[in-house]
From Swiss-Prot:
Lineage: Eukaryota, Metazoa, Chordata, Craniata, Vertebrata
Record carries keyword Metal-binding: yes
Family of the protein in this entry: Belongs to the FPP/GGPP synthase family.
Keywords: Isoprene biosynthesis, Lipid metabolism, Magnesium, Metal-binding, Mitochondrion, Transferase, Ubiquinone biosynthesis
Reactions listed under catalytic activity: 7 isopentenyl diphosphate + (2E,6E)-farnesyl diphosphate = all-trans-decaprenyl diphosphate + 7 diphosphate; 6 isopentenyl diphosphate + (2E,6E)-farnesyl diphosphate = all-trans-nonaprenyl diphosphate + 6 diphosphate
InterPro entries assigned to the protein according to its UniProt record, in alphabetical order: Isoprenoid_synthase_dom_sf, Polyprenyl_synt, Polyprenyl_synt_CS
Species whose genome carries this gene: Mus musculus
Record-given protein name: All trans-polyprenyl-diphosphate synthase PDSS1
Any one GO molecular function term: metal ion binding
Cofactor(s), by name: Mg(2+)
Length: 409
């Protein structure tokens, strides 16, 4: 037990490391979740048991009402070695994203008025543009690391557009699958134009993204983004299923989280690194940063479903419970309230299930444990990106990982 705890602590400590060949991990898994080689005969600690030990031993855990408050552990990345605060990643990223949504609308090339209105509905400049911001910052950080180049290539900026288009297409399709009526504080495409037309609008955005991607002319990059689209579909199928065993259930949840959210960020980061730097070590650093930030982003999103109001989120809260989906806070809460198992297996389908499950989550430490897990993913992301040569953009990516943990919508 002591040896395993020591290994886990070494795996999660937050400190810079030299550039080297990063260890490959299974998508969607952090080090304490991974299985060891077959030759390792030491007893395996079930994931939830290990997390229970960690949560009781960690001095940086928060109460439910304080989980978004910054702690020394969370904020050790806030300053550079020179003592200066990091640049605002969003302001820095927008230097390369001026005209982003206008450029996307040009890519759509639509003559039919109704289809044009549907396809452009979410490209109104009111989104967070989280993915394009990460992509352009990663592009510059990798370019500087490679040859101190200060300029970003047009092909790298195109990846930012493609990433936002793929993401938006999935929002349109997800809203159809979930029968959602609001997003970003306004009616969904399917609510206004109907499900059939919404599906076609999402398809059109995906096809336009594919054309823009093909113009880049790099087969490796095309393959990476094609993998994203496959992951998105497989992730949606995973979300439709459930597992009876609690450890399988959590692994299932993390795999779904990787495929539905983190794969796009990870592969987009890797794509711009490939376009700007020939070193495969840098490609892996970019991928691992994007993967870990992406998983953390979704974990916090799942937390906000229980802790934010609908006005803040721009969409209904407790939405996942209403759809029969058990996210991190629910799975952790189930450890304290085993009666939730039956609710999870029947996908909260009986009258009163959603309200009872929500109360169980808020009475448990499910929110804190999910937030703590998100912290660990962000720590891993920071350790990866610190392997690159120091730059304003690299530091902004570190700051961005903190903003993932402290966001409220």
């Amino acid at each position: 037990m002591a040896m395993r705890w020591s290994c886990w602590r070494r795996g999660c400590s937050w400190r810079p490391t030299a550039v080297g060949s990063p260890r490959r991990e299974r998508p969607g898994c952090v080090e304490p979740l991974g299985t060891r080689a077959a030759s390792d005969t030491r007893a395996q600690i079930p994931y939830f048991s290990l997390m229970k030990i960690l949560m009781s031993a960690s001095p940086t855990m928060h109460s439910i009402s304080q989980f978004h408050q910054r702690t020394p552990a969370m904020c050790s990345c806030r300053q550079t070695q020179s003592g200066e605060k990091y640049s605002d990643p969003f302001k820095l990223g927008w230097r390369d994203l001026k005209g982003l949504y206008e450029d996307i609308r040009k890519e759509l090339h639509i003559s039919t008025r109704e289809l044009k209105d549907m396809s452009e509905y979410y490209f109104d400049g009111k989104g967070k543009a989280f993915r394009p911001i990460i992509v352009v910052l990663m592009a510059r950080a990798c370019n500087i690391h490679h040859n101190n180049a200060r300029e970003m290539q047009a092909s790298q900026r195109s990846i930012a557009l493609v990433a936002e288009m793929i993401h938006t297409a999935t929002l349109v399709h997800d809203d159809v699958i979930d029968d959602a009526s609001s997003r970003r504080g306004k009616h969904t495409v399917n609510k206004i134009w109907g499900e059939k037309k919404a599906v076609l609008a999402g398809d059109l955005i995906l096809s336009a993204a594919s054309v823009a991607l093909a113009r880049i002319g790099n087969t490796a990059v095309v393959s990476m983004l094609a993998q994203v689209i496959e992951d998105l579909v497989r992730g949606e199928f995973l979300q439709l299923g459930s597992k009876e065993n609690e450890n399988e259930r959590f692994a299932h949840y993390l795999e779904k989280t990787f495929k539905k959210t983190a794969s796009l960020i990870a592969n987009s980061c890797k794509a711009v690194s490939v376009l700007g730097c020939p070193d495969p070590v840098v490609h892996e650093i970019a991928y691992q940063y994007g993967k870990n930030v992406g998983i953390a982003f979704q974990l916090i999103d799942d937390v906000l479903d229980f802790t934010s109001c609908s006005d803040q989120m721009g969409k209904p809260t407790s939405a996942d419970l209403k759809l029969g989906i058990a996210t991190g806070p629910v799975l952790f809460a189930c450890q304290q309230f085993p009666e939730m198992n039956a609710m999870i297996m029947r996908r909260f389908s009986l009258p009163g299930d959603v309200d009872r499950a929500r109360q169980y989550v808020l009475q448990s430490d499910g929110v804190q444990q999910t937030t703590y897990l998100a912290q660990q993913y962000c720590h891993k992301a920071v350790r990866e990106i610190r392997k690159l040569r120091p730059s304003t953009e690299r530091d902004a990516l570190i700051q961005l990982s903190e903003s993932v943990l402290t966001r409220d919508k």
